[in-house]
Amino acid sequence: RSDVGYRAKLYGYDNVFCPEAVVYHVGSGTSGSKYNSFKVKLAARNNVYLNYKNMRTWQLLLNSPCLLAGTFVKFLFFKKMGFGKDYVSGFLEGIRTLKNCKRVPSFKGRIQREIGIQLELIAGTAVYVYEFSRRQAAKLGAKV
């Protein structure tokens, strides 16, 4: 899902939220429950692929602190659920097999779209941090 959405943005499409939309997806149809070893490994690997395939090197470097922080937070989440080793295994598999991934090619107008996407990522991160901080402050206020 994320890969298609990111690539669509690169090619000039808008991603919009449509609450009335109905999507049929057999995501867990063959892989089992919400979280299992197979799905955790696959998700970790695919997160590596998503960024590598769609971002140029300058974006990977610019976003690396946030990407690494997000990877660490996901690792902690899956470790708490008993899937820490599976997450690391999938992440490392993604790194090892990057050479098999086909990156989105260059095309006219891509740099402008990349800059636009980058600004959206920065703004979205700022909003997320702000809202997360407010939720945490509200929790602390309720506990005091």
Q: Language-model segments: what does each one mean?
A:
Residues 1-22:
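A short, conserved alpha-helix in the catalytic core of glycosyltransferases
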Residues 54:
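Extracellular glycan-interaction patches encoded by glycine-rich segments
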Residues 24-45, 76-86:
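Nucleotide-sugar-dependent glycosyltransferase catalytic core
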Residues 50-51, 94:
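Short alpha-helical functional segments enriched in proximate histidine and acidic residues
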Residues 60-144:
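Non-catalytic, C-terminal membrane-associated alpha-helical segments of glycosyltransferases
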Residues 22-24, 67:
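Positions that flank functional sites
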